[in-house]
Amino acid sequence: MSLIDRDLKVIWHPYTQMQTAMPPIPIVRGEGSCVYDENGKKYIDGVSSWWVNIHGHAHPYIAKKVAEQLTKLEHVIFAGFTHEGAVELAERLLAILPANQKKAFYSDNGSTAIEVGIKMCLQYWHNQGKTRTKMLAFKNAYHGDTFGAMAVSGRSAFTAAFDSLLFEVEFIDLPTAENISDLKSQISNLKSELACFIFEPLVQGTAGMLMYEAKYLNELMAHCRENNVLMIADEIFTGFGRTGKRFACEYVTEVPDIMCFSKGLTGGTMALGITTCTQAIFDAFLSDDRLKTLFHGHSFTANPVACAAALASMDLFLEDATLENIKRIEAMHQQFALKIQHHPKIKTKRQTGTILAMEWETGNNTSYFSSLRDTLYKYFLAAGIILRPLGNIIYILPPYCITNDELNYIYGKIEQALEEI
C-alpha cells in the first residue's frame, strides 16, 4: 500500500474537504527552501510551509541544537520548575521587543498564544473588580482556530458553524485617512466596556494579505492608550522579519500591552507559542487571593526541545546575513511587482517586506472557494512550486534562504500563468 493510500485511510487533513480534495503529496525530506517528494521531485516552498519556516528546511544548526537538547532534557513540568532554555529564550526575546514588554508566558502554538493574551486582558479587569468584557478587533481578522481566537477573528467560513457560540466582539474596519476619525469615535463610545483591542499589525494574512498603513495603526493605538484600552499585537505571522523589520510593531511608535508569537519563533522546526506582557498586567495577578491566579497552562509548556530550537533560530535570525536576505527578498519583490502591475489580469498588488500578494482579476468571484484557487494551486505544483492562493489572491512568502534563481523561477511561472490561465 502506498503512503498516499495509507494516509487517506487514517488521516484527516486541516482545511481540507476530504471528499473532493486531491491526494496529499508525500514529502520525504527538506533542504534549504525546498522539499522533495517520494519520487525525488523538488518543490520550492514559496509559502514557508504555512508561514513558519524562516531559515530553510532541516537547517543543520537548528538540528544540532535540538539533538543536543534531546540528550539532556526532553521535557519537565513547568509549574514549580524551570530550565535554562526557557529562561534564556524569554530573556533574549524580551530584549529585542518594545521596552514595556517584561514577562513571557509559554504555550504550544499561535492559537494558544492568542488565548493566553485574551485571558490576560479579561482577567486583568476582572481582578480589579471592573466589568470590561468586550473585545475590539478588525473585520476579516484571523487569530487562530481555538474558540477564543475564533471569536476575535472575522466571521467567515472558518467560524460559520460556531458563530452562535462565540463571545461578543466589536469589529471595525482597517484604519485609513478617510475613516480614522470615525474609528476613534467608536472606541471613545465603547471605552468603558472594552477589555482590549487585538490586531494583526500592518498585514492581515489569512484575509488575503490585506495591508494598511502604520501611521493609522499608530493613531488608533494612541487613542486606545488615551482611553485605557489594552492592546494585543498578534505578531504570530508578522514577527521575525516578515514585514522587513524584526517585528511589525517596530513600524509604530505606540507600544502594545501584550504581544503574541509562534510560527517563525522556532524557525518553523516545531510548535511553540509565547505571549509577552507589561509589568502592569503581570502585577494585576499578584495577590494573596489565589482566585486572581492566571489559571492557564499546557502539558508541554516551555518544552525544552522547542526552546532549544527557538534559541538556535534566534541565533540565526540576529545574524547580519539574515537581515541582508530579508532586504534582498524585499527588493526583488518590489521589482517584480512593478513589472506586472499593469497586467490586465492583475487587479491589485501589495507588498510589505518579504510578503508579496497579487489579486487576480476575477470580476465578482473573489470567494475563498474560488475555482481559480485550485487551478492555480495545481498549476504551480506541476511546476515544482508550493503556492497556496487565498481564493483569487496569489502570495509569495519564502524562507529567507531562498536564492535569487529560485525567486526568479517563481516570478517566471507566475508570469506564465498570467498568459496561460
Ranges and model annotations:
Residues 1-421:
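Conserved N-terminal phosphate-binding loop of PLP-dependent enzymes in the Aspartate aminotransferase
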